[in-house]
Amino acid sequence: MGGQRHTMIDDAAQRRRLEAGLAEIGLALPPDRIDTLFAYLALLRKWNGVYNLTAIRHPDEMLTHHLLDSLAAVPALAEMARSSEVGGAARGRVLDVGSGGGMPGLPLAISCPDVSVLMVDIVQKKTAFLTQCRAQLGLSNAAAHWGPVERLEDPDKFAVITSRAFAELTDFVNLSGHLLAPHGRLIAMKGVYPQAELDRMEAAGLMAAWQVEEVRRLTVPGLDAERHLVLLSRK
């Protein structure tokens, strides 16, 4: 007989893997926030078929390739968002560009209630999902915006602008750089060391106004693949 195949989910085992991953990353979260992370993962699984949020379908891979992958960047994102170098209303504000299913924006907002996260995407059904998550998870520090980031205007600016699967570094800088506060940082999440992208950024003349502060290697629990954070700031 035909029919849809369903993957059995061992919630207890997934919770243990999430808790172990958080410990490995160095994120000490209270039980209620771990509950919320787990609830977000359940929403991602539930609505993926409707909203086409990710090509990854297996629950274990969603945990490693999406949730833990995003959580591995949270310490750096939160540190830069809270930086005393950033003044005014921008401090503590993060813009997640091309957020899709909410990564890394929602894991960041769940883990750090003092950080305000705006997630932007050009696909309306994805921002609808993000708005639904905000309501169901009770995240007053998260919001979603539908539309291209290059048309977004925000007078308060952002301490951190991040992207996980949005665009090349050159496009990331050109399209979202106008929203960065003085002394803020663009933080791009990449896989392998993005030397070719850095070279193209230099060839485009962007290094006259921007500098690469650091390319930081990340370790994602349970994921045997390279991950890097590219930290950019204005000169």
Swiss-Prot record:
Q: Which GO terms describe its cellular component?
A: cytosol
Positions contributing to S-adenosyl-L-methionine binding? G98, M103, V149, E150, R164
Annotated InterPro entries: rRNA_ssu_MeTfrase_G (IPR003682), SAM-dependent_MTases_sf (IPR029063)
Which chemical reaction does it catalyze? guanosine(527) in 16S rRNA + S-adenosyl-L-methionine = N(7)-methylguanosine(527) in 16S rRNA + S-adenosyl-L-homocysteine
The EC number on file is: 2.1.1.170
What's the family?
Belongs to the methyltransferase superfamily. RNA methyltransferase RsmG family.
Purpose of the protein = Specifically methylates the N7 position of guanine in position 527 of 16S rRNA.
Its protein name is Ribosomal RNA small subunit methyltransferase G
Gene that encodes it: rsmG
